[in-house]
Design a protein with these regions (language model features):
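Core SAM-dependent methyltransferase catalytic element
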Residues: 207-229
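A short acidic, Gly/Pro-enriched loop at the edge of an enzyme's catalytic core
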Residues: 100-112
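Class I SAM-dependent methyltransferase SAM/SAH-binding core
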Residues: 49-101
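A short SAM/SAH-binding and catalytic strip from SAM-dependent methyltransferases
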Residues: 110-124
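N-terminal, positively charged/glycine-rich alpha-helical extensions of SAM-dependent methyltransferases
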Residues: 1-20, 161, 172, 176
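Conserved alpha-helix/loop element of class I SAM-dependent methyltransferases that forms part
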Residues: 30-47
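C-terminal alpha-helical "lid/dimerization" subdomain adjacent to the S-adenosyl-L-methionine
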Residues: 148-202, 212
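A short glycine-rich, Lys/Arg-flanked "PGG" loop and its adjoining helix->strand segment in the class I
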Residues: 125-140
Length: 229
């Protein structure tokens, strides 16, 4: 999970939820989150060393291992990293650090994945540039974020995030009622401030080319990926 400002708020909110994160996260996304994560990983060409940023309990890292990648995971939450360590043992090298100050040299990794991070960062443009810094030329950076559906799906999305998410969070597990109430505002605010055209500028400014965008599940999930120049 991410960490000062929006980062600190998110870290404090999610920190105690590690033991139930995988199960409840899948339910709150109506079963879509695992599908989105698999699609994210499928964007990468086979082989190589991948840095998985905001690795959390290791859901994306696990998909990367299944596809034969060497994986390094990074997160700011020691609790989440402890759960990832239990999941992987020595199969994944784990680091506790901030995504906007990575403890790696330039061009250290073949590819990079990042999940549900940028909307929590105080300067997402600078964070994306920092992520791209550690990827070798020709490598891919791939990001998964929650999105805001358009068209006829928008009213249904608003109903779900305003009523369904908080209620479901309250029923499913302790602590998740606050997350349910927090997520809708967080997602809506991020996309209002940062429409896709602005985000594409971030990617280009970070030295990423051929940037592609795929909206999944009527726009509830958004995967972006681009090649490091």
């Amino acid at each position: 999970m991410p960490a000062g400002g929006r980062q600190e708020e998110a870290r404090e909110l999610f920190a105690p939820l590690g033991p139930t994160y995988d199960r409840v996260g899948a339910v709150l996304s109506l079963g879509q989150d695992p599908l989105w994560r698999r699609f994210l990983v499928s964007r990468l060409p086979p082989g190589g060393h991948v840095l998985d940023v905001a690795t959390g309990t290791g859901l994306v890292a696990e998909e990367l291992l299944k596809r034969g990648f060497r994986v390094t995971g990074l997160d700011q939450s020691p609790g989440m990293l402890a759960l990832a360590g239990q999941r992987f043992g020595h199969r994944v090298e784990l680091h506790e650090a901030s995504a906007d100050a990575l403890p790696f040299d330039d061009k250290s990794f073949d590819h990079l994945t990042v999940t549900y991070l940028l909307r929590y960062m105080d300067d997402p443009r600078a964070t994306l540039a920092e992520l791209a810094r550690v990827v070798r030329p020709g490598g891919l950076v791939a990001s998964l974020e929650f999105g805001v559906p358009g068209g006829p799906a928008r009213p249904l999305w608003e109903l779900y995030v305003n009523v369904g998410l908080p209620l479901a969070g309250r029923v499913l597990a302790n602590g998740w009622n606050e997350v349910g109430g927090f997520l809708g505002d967080s997602i809506r605010d991020f996309w209002a401030r940062n429409p896709i055209e602005r985000q594409l500028e971030w990617w280009r400014d970070a030295g990423l080319s051929d940037v592609q965008v795929r909206r999944l599940s009527l726009g509830g999930g958004v995967v972006m990926w681009g090649t490091r120049i």
